Curated annotation (Swiss-Prot):
GO terms for molecular function: cytokine binding; growth hormone receptor activity; peptide hormone binding. It comes from Bos taurus (Bovine). GO terms for biological process: cytokine-mediated signaling pathway; endocytosis; growth hormone receptor signaling pathway; positive regulation of cell population proliferation; positive regulation of receptor signaling pathway via JAK-STAT. Keywords: Cell membrane, Disulfide bond, Endocytosis, Glycoprotein, Membrane, Phosphoprotein, Receptor, Secreted, Signal, Transmembrane, Transmembrane helix, Ubl conjugation. This is Growth hormone receptor. Residues 19-260 are extracellular. A motif (Box 1 motif) lies at residues 293-301.
Length: 634
């Protein structure tokens, strides 16, 4: 037996290099355990009924104890039959357990004198001289602290509903651990549950000795326990005593179980019901919703016009309806310049012989008034409205009024002037000559009061007879301005006429001597011609020198012969002042714009303020008919 102990001692001494250093690793302990098993093969198996180690534990890293079980063999249960030996690096031999009593039955207690930290230990159990169990460890690996002590709790607050509460649980570390000095660092783990539950709820590990617990129900009781372990290890110590938490009795109505209303189900069913309602609403109002989302395209509709007329293409009827309104004019644009839309009636040559523009303007004939306002526009709009473009056929004789015609054909013009004077004498002697102008006189009523009044053109038969008598008197014509030219058309559609100047009363006569007759007199026999300004001046300047014994007014055989009123009045005024005394007759107000169209035969003219006597009325280039020229020329 002593030999075997010697061999074991040698083996431990030979492996002492594995325990060199300040600490031993588990690998070294495993190798030491394997060496012991080689030396003692009987330790490999623990025969049934033999004692064995259950655990070795150090509560504070200063002391430790080891425990084992009783063997089934009754011979091993007798006191002293089982012994425990230990060995460590600094001791070269096996030593028996120093204390079998302090740690309890079947245990061995090592106080601080026999405990070395970071030093590997190997222990063995022997019975009747034979080894029954063995184990190797290090003290820091078997640390299992004692449970915390002094658990208690503190109420933090209660919810406004008096249903939930918050508490703070506190405890103290194990009294035998030197936590304050930092010899050991502990981690705590708290478990809690309701009183009637079996499953504990665990909180995360903490390194403090207090932890708050939130939202605990006041009508419940809770159990709390705490355990601890050394930091960076996995083995916890025992749990502390269970702490029972009971809240003070509150208002019974507040402590009652709050009703768990099934909000989730209500929300689900509400959404489903809303979806079904929307589906039924859309299905029942499908057409109306379709019209709201996609409204139909409105049909073309003009107030006062039947849409069927537009569909059937009856544009003439539509234009007739639109013509009723003032802001609509057929085939005209209100925004365009009126100069570009001046119309001259030159399509029908037969109408040129029916009368002058003055006769057409003042005539009772409905067709002539319509032709004036609805004539075709052959003017390009580039020239002045006061210089109308007339066909060359209408001016084949009036062209002689220019300077070149006077130089090239003086003899021919002189002969034609003689013929003109003879024709005028014959016309003056004939009785029909006096009645013809009277029948062609337009019906004009001049109303003169203290304030301007409208001038009515085209009235009833009574007014026609009165005006006929007035216009037949040559003396009355001296104070009446004739409106023979449309000088402007306002954007509202009003026609602005250009008045002529008042002329001196007198009866011009044509002399039979051919040497005093100007070539321009021959132009009066031309149809649809205009008197040029140069020829008119020459004619009027030479007219006072004609002998007065004939007393025959110059006859203008054609109605549509015009001269410019500006040149006519200027020249006539100069010649009249040389031979006659200025007339003292009261001037008649000018009527230069159309006030309203009463009927196709009636126009109401607006009277304007009388011009100053000394101010010369400068009118645009106007045209005077032959009848007016015969009556107002000196």
């Amino acid at each position: 037996m002593d030999l075997w102990q010697l061999l074991l001692t040698l083996a431990v001494a030979g492996s002492s290099d594995a325990f060199s250093g300040s600490e031993a690793t588990p690998a070294f302990l495993v190798r030491a355990s394997q060496s012991l098993q080689i030396l003692y093969p009987v330790l490999e198996t623990n025969s049934s009924g033999n004692p064995k180690f259950t655990k070795c534990r150090s509560p504070e890293l200063e002391t430790f104890s080891c425990h084992w079980t009783d063997g089934a063999n009754h011979s091993l249960q007798s006191p002293g039959s089982v012994q425990m030996f230990y060995i460590r690096r600094d001791i070269q031999e096996w030593k028996e357990c120093p204390d079998y009593v302090s740690a309890g039955e079947n245990s061995c207690y090592f106080n601080s004198s026999y405990t070395s930290v970071w030093t590997p230990y190997c222990i063995k159990l022997t019975s009747n001289g034979g080894i029954v169990d063995h184990k190797c460890f290090s003290v820091e690996d078997i640390v299992q602290p004692d449970p915390p002590v002094g658990l208690n709790w503190t109420l933090l607050n209660i919810s406004l509903t008096e249903i939930h509460a918050d508490i703070l649980v506190k405890w103290e570390p194990p009294p035998n651990t030197d936590v304050k000095m930092g010899w050991i660092i502990l981690e705590y783990e708290l478990h809690y549950k309701e009183l009637n539950e079996t499953q504990w709820k665990m909180m995360d590990p903490l390194m403090v000795t207090s932890v708050p617990m939130y939202s605990l129900r006041l009508d419940k009781e809770y159990e709390v326990r705490v355990r601890t372990r050394q930091r960076n290890t996995e083995k916890y110590g025992k749990f502390s005593e269970v702490l029972l938490i009971t809240f003070p009795q509150m208002n019974p109505s507040a402590c009652e179980e709050d009703f768990q209303f099934p909000w989730f189900l209500i929300i689900i069913f509400g959404i489903l019901g809303l979806a079904v309602t929307l589906y039924l609403l859309i299905f029942s109002k499908q057409q109306r919703i379709k019209m709201l989302i996609l409204p139909p395209v409105p049909v073309p509709k003009i107030k006062g016009i039947d849409p069927d007329l537009l569909k059937e293409g009856k544009l003439e009827e539509v234009n007739t309806i639109l013509a009723i309104h003032d802001n609509y004019k057929h085939e005209f644009y209100n925004d365009d310049s009126w100069v570009e839309f001046i119309e001259l009636d030159i399509d029908d040559p037969d109408e040129k012989t029916e009368g002058s523009d003055t006769d057409r303007l003042l005539s009772n004939d409905h067709e002539k008034s319509l032709n004036i306002f609805g004539a075709k526009d052959d003017d390009s709009g580039r020239t002045s409205c006061y210089e109308p473009d007339i066909l060359e056929a209408d001016f084949h004789v009036s062209d002689m009024c220019d300077g070149t015609s006077e130089v090239a054909q003086p003899q021919r013009l002189k002969g034609e002037a003689d013929i003109s004077c003879l024709d005028q004498k014959n016309q003056n002697n004939s009785p029909s000559n006096d009645a013809a102008p009277a029948s062609q006189q337009p019906s004009v009523i001049l109303v003169e009061e203290n304030k301007p009044r409208p001038l009515l053109i085209g009235g009833t038969e009574s007014t026609h007879q009165a005006v006929h008598t007035q216009l037949s008197n040559p003396s009355s014509l001296a104070n009446i301005d004739f409106y023979a030219q449309v000088s402007d058309i306002t954007p509202a559609g009003n026609v602005v006429l250009s008045p002529g100047q008042k002329n001196k009363t007198g009866n011009p006569q044509c002399d039979t001597h051919p040497e005093v007759v100007t070539p321009c007199q021959a132009n009066f026999i031309v149809d649809n011609a205009y008197f040029c300004e140069v020829d008119a001046k020459k004619y009027i300047a030479l007219a006072p020198h004609v002998e007065a014994e004939s007393h025959v007014e110059p006859s203008f055989n054609q109605e549509d012969i015009y001269i410019t009123t500006e040149s006519l009045t200027t020249t006539a005024g100069r010649s009249g002042t040389a031979e006659h005394v200025p007339s003292s007759e009261i001037p008649v107000p000018d009527y230069t714009s159309i006030h309203i169209v009463q009927s196709p035969q009636g126009l109401v003219l607006n009277a304007t303020a009388l011009p100053l006597p000394d101010k010369e009325f400068l009118s645009s280039c106007g045209y005077v008919s032959t009848d007016q020229l015969n009556k107002i020329m000196p």
